[in-house]
Amino acid sequence: MDTKNVYKIFLIQTMKTVISLGGSLISLDNLDYIRNVAELIEKASQDFDLYVVVGGGKLARQYIKAARHFCNDERYLDKLGILATRLNAFLLASFFKKDIPETIEEAAKQETPVIMGGTTPGHSTDAVAAMLAKHINAYRLIIATDVDGIYDKDPKKHADAKKYDEISIEKLKEMIGKEWSRAGESVVIDAIACKIISKAKIKTFVLNGKNLQQLENAIYGKQFNGTVIVTK
C-alpha cells in the first residue's frame, strides 16, 4: 500500500478549507491577481478540498450607491450586492470553466474547488463562508481581506493601529458590535459571521489576501502574518 497516497487522500477528505475572498481583492483592473489567486487555488486543490466565497467589493458598492437614488429598502439593495458577488465569483470561476452554486447546499455537493458568491439578503460573504464552513464541517476558515489581520482600530485611518496576532472570539464580538444591516458595508468581519464562528468553534484566520504567499501559508498550515481567532 502506498502510504503517501493514503495520507494525501486523508488530508483532502478531512482538511476542508473555506476561504472568504474579499471583494476588495477582485477587480477588473487587476486581472493578474485574479489569475494568480486562481492558480493558487488550483494548486492547493490537489491537497485540500477548497471552497471559495467571493465578496462584491467596489462593484457591489457602486451599484448599491446608484440604486439608493431610487430605493431605500436594505433587503432589496442587498440583493443587488449579492448579484455583484456572483459576478465576481463567476469571473474567478471562469479560470476553471465552472458554474457557481447559489446556495450552501449546492456548494457542498459540487466537486472542488468550489467558487461562489453571496446567497441571501442580510448575510455578508464572510457570514456565508462561516455558514458553509459549519455546514461541511471544514477544518478551517480563512478570511482574506485587504489588511494584514484584525486591528484595535481601522489601520487605513489610524497609523498607530495595532494588529492582533491572536484574539478571542468574545473580544472580537465586543469590538464589532451586534449588527450588520446596511447593504454595501465593508468590515473585516461582521457580527453574523462572528456568531457562527463562535457557536461552531471554527478555526479562523484573518490575513491580507493581496499577499498570496501568506494565503498559501495559511492554507497549508504554515506560519503566516495575520490574526488567529481563538474560539475556545
Please name every model-derived segment.
Residues Y7-K232:
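C-terminal catalytic "cap/lid" subdomain
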